[in-house]
Amino acid sequence: MKILNKILILILGVCLSMGAVFVGGTAKVSAEKGLKNNLTVSGGTLTESDNGYNGTEAVKLTFNGKTSVLRVKNNEINALKTFDTVTVEFRLKYDGTGYNNTLRVYKAEGDLVDYGYPANVWNKVRFKTMVYTENGENFVKVELDFAANKTAYISDLKVTASEEDKPLLGGVKLISLESITLAMGYVVITPDNKVIVIDGGYVGGDTDIMLKLLRTFTHKVDYWFLTHFHTDHTTVPAQLIEYQDIEIENLYYDFPTSQMVKDLSSDSDYPFCDKFEDLVKNNPQKVKNVIKPHYKDEYKLGEYVTMKVLNNAWYTERNGNYGNNSGIMFKMETPGESVLFTGDMGDRGDVYLNDEWSRKEIESCTLIQMAHHGQNGTSDAFYNAIKDIKVCLYPAVDWIYNNDNGSGFNTANLDSLHIRDLMRERGVMNIYTSGMGRKIIL
């Protein structure tokens, strides 16, 4: 598939970990003495160290320049096939003097794992990648970006091989727009060529990005779902309906009236509710069917995807976070894993956990769209209720993801770093944000 400029394409064909193929289940490259013997480096130098995590062996990496690329090699890795999926795990500590929180970890080729790691403490790093082959020898890449003459320590390193016969979403492709605003938009392409969109983004640059992407596949959207009425989620579909030749076969949304929002909150987006309703009614040639989702509704979207409605939309209680809390959460079921789209859901997410059916549906999802752009959304209890989070989807540009008010990392008053730490401690391996230019993910 062609990767369009300004479009973040996440082809979630990551293979499920079905158990290691190595004898004993895991290929530990952190032998009692010999971690350094399993590593080679370009762009830096490696020395042995006893300063490892919990007393284990470590290697000290000194950066020659900004980027150092490690290659992990051993007999077990060499027994695998090129492009086999593996999980890499290690502990990382670095000297942050003058460069605190700036170290970045990549899988390879600019494919970012994460950044913003706290300095001078042991951070847990875990991600899926693939086996590379060069000159008949297999290896796994880990790329670190930092600063010349700075040091980092790597300890407790292990590589686990996993079967690659089961794509994460069963062949369904999930595409996240690389938003230039703080907006949210996801496109789903199924093996039977159904085009599904969730939200869409903010008027302006996001409209052009979405339009280019949709025209790559079709001039028609089969199913378009809107979580709530806020303009950073909905003005892109509004622009396409009003000004472009995109046809929407089925549009799913349920907004309160503008007057209701005005009466129950101080939300400044309240005029958009009625404007959008009028726009849809006045363009029946572009919007063929309008469906108002309700609690427990299920929609079969072709042969491969089912969308479930986990809660009713707006309510009649005054609330300072009314716009976000009036949204709908959708669960997308595929032949593989299930995806939870939370939109901007706030503290009302906990209310839906009290409903037996909703809780069961929520806790069984494994790919999670982080609520309200990954900060000040649903509670820790909401995320902790989800049993096995494999992937976090952040509809967040860099300044939100890094809590940056323009003065650098962690200088704003957002909740994003707390949520990132929560996911990191749970060992989530794959974190995707709309503010990072990603390549195709395995």
Please annotate each region the language model reported:
Residues E48-T67:
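Short carbohydrate-recognition loop motifs
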Residues N250-Y252, P256-N324, V391, A396-L442:
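Binuclear metal-ion centers of metallo-dependent hydrolases, dominated by the metallo-beta-lactamase
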Residues R126-K158:
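Extracellular beta-strand ligand-recognition surfaces/modules
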Residues T62-F83, N100, Y106-Y115:
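Secreted extracellular polysaccharide-interacting domains
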Residues E178-G185, P191-F217, F225-Y243, L310-I400:
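Active-site-proximal loop/helix segments of hydrolase catalytic cores
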Residues E109-E137:
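Extracellular carbohydrate recognition and processing domains
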Residues L39, V59, V72-G98, V125-T129, ...:
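Extra-cytoplasmic beta-strand recognition segments
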